[in-house]
From Swiss-Prot:
Pathway: tRNA modification; 5-methoxycarbonylmethyl-2-thiouridine-tRNA biosynthesis; Cofactor biosynthesis; molybdopterin biosynthesis. GO terms for cellular component: cytoplasm; cytosol. This is Adenylyltransferase and sulfurtransferase MOCS3. InterPro entries: MOCS3/Uba4 (IPR028885), Rhodanese-like_dom (IPR001763), Rhodanese-like_dom_sf (IPR036873), ThiF/MoeB/HesA (IPR045886), ThiF_NAD_FAD-bd (IPR000594), Ubiquitin-activating_enz (IPR035985). It comes from Dictyostelium discoideum. Plays a central role in 2-thiolation of mcm(5)S(2)U at tRNA wobble positions of cytosolic tRNA(Lys), tRNA(Glu) and tRNA(Gln). Also essential during biosynthesis of the molybdenum cofactor. Acts by mediating the C-terminal thiocarboxylation of sulfur carriers urm1 and mocs2a. Its N-terminus first activates urm1 and mocs2a as acyl-adenylates (-COAMP), then the persulfide sulfur on the catalytic cysteine is transferred to urm1 and mocs2a to form thiocarboxylation (-COSH) of their C-terminus. It catalyses: [molybdopterin-synthase sulfur-carrier protein]-C-terminal Gly-Gly + ATP + H(+) = [molybdopterin-synthase sulfur-carrier protein]-C-terminal Gly-Gly-AMP + diphosphate; [molybdopterin-synthase sulfur-carrier protein]-C-terminal Gly-Gly-AMP + S-sulfanyl-L-cysteinyl-[cysteine desulfurase] + AH2 = [molybdopterin-synthase sulfur-carrier protein]-C-terminal-Gly-aminoethanethioate + L-cysteinyl-[cysteine desulfurase] + A + AMP + 2 H(+). PROSITE patterns: RHODANESE_3. Its cofactor is Zn(2+). Coiled coil: none annotated.
């Protein structure tokens, strides 16, 4: 006599592990088997990718793919919960894979320690049923979207910044793709990065968990509840969830429309005028070389003539309060072109010039090295370039009274080249 009857292939240890899902309406045995036989690719093993991967692995997804070229840093740990202090310096994909294996040894995990690019995307995506966009930059979003449309894969997309996050599903059940909603990339200067705007760990946790939930709904064929053609927005500060309708599938879309013009992957860094990583490389020079000084030159200059300079830190006050160089004056870039700020800067310059003149018996013949230098600094040497251009124009009436210079590579450069004890964030 048989001990028990089961008309499915779930093993006893799987029934025990996934039991609470098995008895959930709209999941059941068929739903769990779909999960166990499915494969999901997660682009990004960071703030969003970690909760997505942890919850999908716990749910019993048969195969997970993790794509991330980056390594774990201590600054990641407040929000990237799949990594540990002991993982510092190792691949994020490998680190997250290790955590997943400790959580559920029944599933398979593939790691791709590479940048997701036009050259690698199609070969990786073709092996998976669903793709999750857990990236942090515009170029990757367009790339992932186009690759999913060209391969016919549903895309679950999420994003988070500061206290807010949002999630939707693209290329599913005749719904829109990312290009239907955003045909052209936003101007680079309008995009706020996580490293500049900040983000709370629980926010990416909420959005990542919701992304995992959308994947489960798609794989278990719960079509009606999927966020296709709808955008869910979460405001953590006010504790409000909103779901809004978004533009539907567009017949004129360049990639999923009736007559697509994008039939193969393109150069997305050129298309978006941005990199595949928000931390890729140094900040490019965008001002005349006469307005630039290196951190080494700045350090030597203030050593030689510590009193005859004015240092303006253009970071937001919330960042300035974390740490700053001695004798810095905080005037945020968002306020630097306002009348009140210009008046403050003019007053500071005039006071410095007057003090300098008083210290020189013969001002007309004084050494050029005694000329006042006005230095502008920010976190990475990006916003200080904008500031130097603004002040070069706003203060042109008495520009002959001082040198105006932006500090290349900013405070991160100061940490790397001058003082490694200076806090970075």
């Amino acid at each position: 006599m048989e001990k028990y009857i089961k008309e499915h292939t779930l093993k006893p240890n799987e029934i025990e592990r996934y039991g609470r899902q098995l008895i959930t309406p709209d999941i059941g045995v068929s739903g769990q088997m779909s999960l166990c036989n499915s494969s999901v690719l997660i682009i990004g093993a960071g703030g969003l990718g970690c909760p997505v991967a942890l919850y999908l692995s716990s749910a019993g997804i048969g195969t997970l793919g993790l794509v991330d070229y980056d390594t774990v840093e201590i600054s990641n740990l407040h929000r990237q919960i799949g990594h540990r202090e002991s993982s510092k310096g190792i691949s994020k994909a490998v680190s997250l894979s290790k955590t997943i294996s400790e959580l559920n040894s029944l599933i398979k995990v593939n790691t791709y320690e590479t940048t997701f690019t036009s050259e690698t995307a199609m070969e990786i995506i073709k092996n998976y049923d669903i793709v999750v966009d857990a990236s942090d930059n515009v170029a990757t979003r367009y790339l992932v979207n186009d690759a999913c449309v060209l391969t016919g894969k549903p895309l679950v997309s999420g994003s988070a910044l500061k206290w807010e996050g949002q999630i939707t599903c693209y290329n599913y059940n005749n719904g829109p793709c990312y290009r239907c909603i955003f045909p052209t990339p936003p101007p680079v200067e309008t995009v706020t990065k996580c490293s500049d705007g900040g983000v709370l760990g629980p926010i990416v946790g909420v959005i990542g968990s919701l992304q995992a939930l959308e994947v489960i709904k798609i794989l278990t064929n719960n079509k009606e509840g999927v966020l296709s053609g709808r955008l869910l927005i979460y405001d953590g500060m006010s504790a409000v969830f909103r779901t809004v309708r978004i533009r539907g599938k567009q017949s004129g879309c360049n990639v999923c429309g009736d007559k697509p013009t994008v039939t193969q992957l393109i150069d997305y860094t050129q298309f978006c005028q941005s990199n595949y990583s928000e931390s890729a490389g140094k900040v490019d020079d965008r001002v005349d070389k006469t307005l630039i000084i290196t951190v080494e030159q700045f350090n030597q200059s203030i050593k030689n003539n510590n009193n005859n300079h004015l240092l303006i830190d253009v970071r937001p006050k919330i960042q300035f309060d974390i740490c700053s160089l001695p004798n810095s004056n905080n005037i945020p870039i968002e306020e630097i072109d306002k009348k009140e700020s210009i008046e403050i800067i003019e007053k500071l310059i005039k006071e410095k010039v007057e003090n300098n003149n008083n210290n020189n018996n013969n001002n007309e013949n004084r050494d050029a090295s005694d000329e006042l230098s006005v230095y502008l600094v920010c976190r990475r040497g990006n916003k200080s370039q904008d500031a130097v251009k603004i002040l070069d124009e706003k203060l042109k009436e008495f520009r002959d009274k001082f040198k105006l210079l932006h500090i290349k590579d900013g405070l991160l450069g100061w940490n790397e080249s001058i003082d490694d004890s200076f806090p970075i964030y």
